[in-house]
């Protein structure tokens, strides 16, 4: 009997374990499928947005055709020989168009009138590849003749060798040869076809070069900012190269990332970039930065390339590309009546840094003749000591004594972790939003892998509702109200504070972290995520 009971108990234990394992496996698979569906939905949403943008572009192109019809109508007015070439329907259309007086919209030809001299000025002189479209990420690599050493082959190997098979189907690498010497261009193409024949035939790699007629006369440029005539010509041509490459790449994918021809990359870079972008799909960012150096690793949403190219064309002779990009952000969000700190906070919402850097510059000899550049990205080998999120625009302040420049402002903007000397009772960290925000949840993480013991202890999380009166809140929430109008909604446990915000408290004017008791350790804050409500 004991044996039978023991056998039954063993069988029951086995069945229970099996059912538990089956349930967990089903739940885990369901969770993974849900995450995959969410990513597919975000990608679909982004493609719909791009489709809307392209419809708008087509409308603009049709308007241009209408303007051309008007010019034809004006030029053929009174010329019977010319008019006899058109059908009755065309003559009727020309008459209708010519009779309408509408304003002319300026185009890029105003800034680059030389393009009108040749119909093929905006068509690649050389174009190798399958013309792949519909990918997530387009990588643009401009390359020009270097006097000492070319790094292009090594760069492409680094990019391609660090892609998984499925990732190779979801991107395209466009190599732009910024030279008009057709023999040189064909030589580069031959080398690339020999080294990357499989990648070119599959559609992963494309190679283009511009026609000579694309470039204006660059011999009489104004010298500015103390740059020599040669350097001014170099940076001006570089701006034009970027524009041609962006225009070609825009129709190919959801995102466009600007690279250079003398870099190496980290493992898993593609998945990291794509997931980071998808996490920010609900935010109004303009630039994601995956490197600290120059124009390397700067990623844009494809529809935004139109504005960027137009802006660069307007000022391509005036300043380098990185300065022009900063000017675009300034024009979009900075208020001349506010101070520089306010402007930096606003720009930080459009220009988001990812840490650590995914791309490292390795070229010693610049494409500018005679220039040696020992530039390396210091963040490339650094461990990830902070986690970046996009938070609502806010003015931040603290009573804590900051250690070695690890400021709260840098943490909130995703540039560095916050590090402060031993907190005492009464110390605070304050995030005062520029305008009231509906907040869904919050997460504050203290300490990091280098200093895991520097955490916030005996610290509470408090919010200040925008409305001080008339709040329809529960008794439980009401009991959390403090004398100064803040509500205590959470606290740090084991260095972490996270939770949901009672919707009845929204919109929120400020978040505050308040130290209740003296601490025996310093404090690091390496993650701040104040998540806005979606509705």
Swiss-Prot record:
Glycosylated residue positions: 77, 458
PTM per Swiss-Prot/TrEMBL: N-glycosylated.
EC number: 2.4.1.145
Pathway linked to the protein: Protein modification; protein glycosylation
Gene Ontology BP terms: glyoxylate metabolic process; N-glycan processing; protein N-linked glycosylation
Lumenal compartment spans: 28-535
Family per record: Belongs to the glycosyltransferase 54 family.
Name by which UniProt lists this protein: Alpha-1,3-mannosyl-glycoprotein 4-beta-N-acetylglucosaminyltransferase A
Cofactor: a divalent metal cation
Cytoplasmic side: 1-4
A GO CC term attached to the entry: Golgi stack
Keywords: Coiled coil, Glycoprotein, Glycosyltransferase, Golgi apparatus, Membrane, Metal-binding, Phosphoprotein, Secreted, Signal-anchor, Transferase, Transmembrane, Transmembrane helix
GO MF annotations in UniProt: alanine-glyoxylate transaminase activity; alpha-1,3-mannosylglycoprotein 4-beta-N-acetylglucosaminyltransferase activity; metal ion binding; protein homodimerization activity
Membrane topology: Single-pass type II membrane protein
Coiled coil: 28-63
Lineage: Eukaryota, Metazoa, Chordata, Craniata, Vertebrata
Keyword Membrane (UniProt): yes
Residue spans crossing the bilayer: 5-27
Entry-annotated residues carrying Phosphoserine: 474
Activity regulation statement: Inhibited by UDP.
């Amino acid at each position: 009997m004991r044996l039978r009971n023991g056998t039954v108990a063993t069988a029951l234990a086995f069945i229970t374990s099996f059912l538990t394992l089956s349930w967990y496996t089903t739940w885990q698979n369901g969770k993974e499928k849900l995450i995959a569906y969410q990513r597919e939905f975000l990608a679909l949403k982004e493609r719909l947005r791009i489709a809307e943008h392209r419809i708008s572009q087509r409308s603009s192109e049709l308007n241009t055709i209408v303007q051309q019809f008007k010019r034809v109508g004006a030029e053929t007015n009174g010329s019977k020989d010319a008019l006899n070439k058109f059908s009755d329907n065309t003559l009727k259309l020309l008459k209708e168009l010519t009779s309408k007086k509408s304003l002319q919209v300026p185009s890029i030809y105003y800034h680059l009138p030389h393009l009108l001299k040749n119909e093929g000025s905006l068509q690649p002189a050389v174009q190798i590849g399958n013309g792949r479209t519909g990918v997530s990420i387009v990588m643009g690599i401009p390359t020009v003749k270097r006097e000492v050493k070319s790094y292009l082959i090594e760069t492409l190997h680094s990019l391609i060798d660090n892609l998984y098979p499925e990732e190779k189907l979801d991107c395209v690498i466009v190599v732009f040869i910024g030279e008009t010497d057709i023999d040189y261009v064909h030589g580069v193409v031959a080398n690339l076809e020999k080294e990357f024949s499989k990648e070119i035939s599959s559609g992963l790699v494309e190679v283009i070069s511009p026609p000579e007629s694309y470039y204006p006369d660059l011999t009489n440029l104004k010298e500015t900012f103390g740059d020599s005539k040669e350097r001014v010509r170099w940076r001006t041509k570089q701006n034009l190269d970027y524009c041609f490459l962006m225009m070609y790449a825009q129709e190919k994918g959801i995102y466009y990332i600007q690279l250079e021809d003398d870099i190496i990359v980290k493992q898993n870079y593609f998945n990291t970039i794509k997931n980071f972008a998808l996490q920010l799909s609900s935010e109004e960012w303009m630039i994601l930065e995956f490197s600290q150096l120059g124009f390397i690793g700067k990623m844009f949403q494809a529809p935004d390339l139109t504005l960027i190219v137009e802006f660069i064309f307007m000022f391509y002779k005036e300043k380098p590309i990185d300065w022009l990009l900063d000017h675009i952000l300034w024009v979009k969000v900075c208020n001349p009546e506010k101070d520089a700190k306010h402007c930096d906070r606003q720009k930080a919402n459009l220009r988001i840094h990812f840490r650590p850097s995914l791309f490292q510059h390795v070229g010693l000899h610049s494409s500018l003749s005679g220039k040696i550049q020992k530039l390396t990205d210091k963040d490339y080998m650094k461990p990830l000591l902070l986690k970046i999120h996009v938070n609502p625009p806010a003015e931040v302040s603290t009573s804590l004594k900051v250690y070695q420049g690890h400021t709260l402002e840098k943490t909130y903007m995703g540039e560095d972790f916050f590090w402060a000397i031993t907190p005492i009772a009464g110390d605070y960290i304050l995030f005062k939003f520029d305008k009231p925000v509906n907040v869904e949840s919050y997460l504050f993480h203290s300490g990091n892998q280098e200093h895991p013991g520097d955490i916030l202890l005996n610290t509470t999380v408090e919010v200040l509702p925008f409305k001080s009166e008339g709040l329809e809140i529960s008794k439980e929430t009401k009991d959390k109200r403090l004398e100064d109008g803040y509500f205590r909604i959470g606290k740090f446990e084991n260095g972490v504070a996270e939770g949901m915000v009672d919707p009845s408290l929204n919109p929120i004017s400020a978040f505050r972290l308040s130290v209740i008791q003296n601490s025996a350790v310093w404090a690091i804050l390496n993650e701040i995520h104040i998540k806005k409500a979606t509705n």
